[in-house]
C-alpha cells in the first residue's frame, strides 16, 4: 500500500455507527459505550483461539530448543510488545534476552510519538539483522491495520533468516494478506474514535500477548499449578509472594518458609524441590537441570 492509496476500506479505519454522536455524549454515556464496545475484544480472542494455540505451541517449542521470542511493532503495537517482554523477567525469572520487544524508533518511541518511523521497512529489516535472529527464533509482528512497513519489513527479514513468524493484526486477511507461520486476526471492528487503534485494537492485542507469553512460560515449566514458582524475588512485594507460595504449597509456617527461601538463595522452585525431595540446593538444581526446569517432572524422579 503506497502513501497515496486510501486506507478507508480497512476495518480499523472505518467509522463506528454506534459513536456517531460521540462529541455530544454525557460522561456516563461515554463509559457505557466504551464498556459495550470493549465486549468485542472477548469475542475476537475467542474467534482467534486456534491461531493463538498454534502460536503458543510453536513459540514454546522454539524456546525449549534455545530460541528467543521477539515482538516487533510501531506506536501502540510496539509499546505493547515492549511492555509484555519487560514483564517476563520479574514474573518468570527469564533472562532479558529471551523475550524482547522491538519498537520503531527505539527506546525514545516509548514515551514520545514517532509515527513517521513506522513507514521505513528497511529499519525493520535492520532491527532483525542487529539482533542476529536465526532459525531458532520466533518473531511476532504486531500491526493493528496490518500494513505497517516497519513490521512487514522485519517479518520478511526474519523469514529470510529462517525464523518462525507470527502475524497479529486487527483487519481481515482478505483486506491485508500476509504469509506467516501463524496468522492471528483479532477483529474488534471500527473504533469508537475512528482510526484510534490504541483503543479496542490495543486492548485486544494486550490480551493476546498476555495469553501468548504466559502460556509459553507455563509450557516451559515456569509455573506449578497456577503459582509463579520462578518469580524473581527482587522487592518486598515479591518476597512476600514467594513466602506465601511456599506456605500455601508446603504448609510451612511463615518463619519456616523464610528460612527455606534463604537456603534456596531466594529461588522458590528450588525451595519447593528441597522441601519435597529432602535434598540440598545443589541437588535440587541438578534435578531441575536434568528435567529441563520442570518441577513437576523432577518431583516424579
From Swiss-Prot:
Q: Which EC number(s) does UniProt give? A: 4.2.1.126
**Record's keyword annotation contains Lyase:** yes
Signal peptide boundaries: none
What is the protein's species of origin?
Picosynechococcus sp. (strain ATCC 27264 / PCC 7002 / PR-6) (Agmenellum quadruplicatum)
Instruction: Quote the record's miscellaneous comment.
Output: A lyase-type mechanism (elimination/hydration) is suggested for the cleavage of the lactyl ether bond of MurNAc 6-phosphate, with the formation of an alpha,beta-unsaturated aldehyde intermediate with (E)-stereochemistry, followed by the syn addition of water to give product.
- Function recorded in the entry: Specifically catalyzes the cleavage of the D-lactyl ether substituent of MurNAc 6-phosphate, producing GlcNAc 6-phosphate and D-lactate.
The alphabetical list of record keywords is: Carbohydrate metabolism, Lyase
Note the subunit structure: Homodimer.
MF (Gene Ontology): carbohydrate derivative binding; carbon-oxygen lyase activity; ether hydrolase activity
Which one Pfam family would you cite for this protein? GKRP-like_C
This protein's pathway reads:
Amino-sugar metabolism; N-acetylmuramate degradation
Instruction: Write down the InterPro entries for this protein, in alphabetical order.
Output: Etherase_MurQ (IPR005488), Glucokinase_regulatory_CS (IPR005486), MURQ/GCKR (IPR040190), SIS_dom (IPR001347), SIS_dom_sf (IPR046348)
UniProt-listed PROSITE patterns: GCKR, SIS
Q: What is this protein called?
A: N-acetylmuramic acid 6-phosphate etherase
What PANTHER family has UniProt attached to this entry? GLUCOKINASE REGULATORY PROTEIN
Domain SIS: from-to ranges: 59-222
Identify the catalytic residues. 87, 118
Homology family: Belongs to the GCKR-like family. MurNAc-6-P etherase subfamily.
Reactions accelerated catalytically = N-acetyl-D-muramate 6-phosphate + H2O = N-acetyl-D-glucosamine 6-phosphate + (R)-lactate
Amino acid at each position: 500500500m503506497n502513501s497515496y492509496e486510501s486506507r478507508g476500506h480497512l476495518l480499523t479505519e472505518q467509522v463506528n455507527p454506534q459513536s456517531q454522536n460521540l462529541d455530544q455524549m454525557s460522561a456516563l454515556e461515554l463509559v457505557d459505550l466504551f464498556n459495550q464496545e470493549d465486549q468485542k475484544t472477548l469475542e475476537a480472542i475467542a474467534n482467534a483461539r486456534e491461531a493463538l494455540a498454534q502460536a503458543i505451541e510453536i513459540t514454546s517449542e522454539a524456546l525449549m530448543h534455545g530460541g528467543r521470542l521477539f515482538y516487533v511493532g510501531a506506536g501502540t503495537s510496539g509499546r505493547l510488545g515492549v511492555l509484555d517482554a519487560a514483564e517476563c523477567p520479574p514474573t518468570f525469572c527469564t533472562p532479558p534476552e529471551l523475550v524482547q520487544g522491538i519498537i520503531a524508533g527505539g527506546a525514545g518511541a516509548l514515551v514520545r510519538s514517532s509515527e513517521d518511523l513506522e513507514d521505513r521497512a528497511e529499519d525493520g529489516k535492520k532491527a532483525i539483522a542487529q539482533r542476529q535472529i536465526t532459525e531458532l527464533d520466533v518473531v511476532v509482528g504486531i500491526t493493528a491495520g496490518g500494513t505497517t512497513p516497519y513490521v512487514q519489513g522485519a517479518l520478511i527479514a526474519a523469514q529470510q533468516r529462517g525464523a518462525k513468524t507470527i502475524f497479529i493484526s486487527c483487519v481481515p486477511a482478505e483486506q491485508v494478506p500476509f504469509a506467516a507461520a501463524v496468522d492471528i486476526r483479532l477483529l474488534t471492528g471500527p473504533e469508537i474514535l475512528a482510526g484510534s487503534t490504541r483503543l479496542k485494537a490495543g486492548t485486544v492485542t494486550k490480551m493476546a500477548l498476555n495469553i501468548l507469553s504466559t502460556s509459553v512460560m507455563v509450557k516451559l515449566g515456569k509455573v506449578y499449578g497456577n503459582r509463579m514458582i520462578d518469580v524473581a524475588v527482587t522487592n518486598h512485594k515479591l518476597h512476600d509472594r514467594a513466602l506465601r507460595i511456599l506456605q500455601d504449597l508446603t504448609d510451612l509456617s511463615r518463619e519456616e518458609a523464610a528460612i527455606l527461601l534463604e537456603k534456596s538463595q531466594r529461588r522458590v522452585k528450588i525451595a519447593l524441590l528441597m522441601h519435597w525431595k529432602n535434598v540440598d540446593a545443589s541437588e535440587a538444581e541438578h534435578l531441575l537441570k536434568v528435567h529441563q526446569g520442570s518441577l513437576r517432572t523432577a518431583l516424579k524422579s
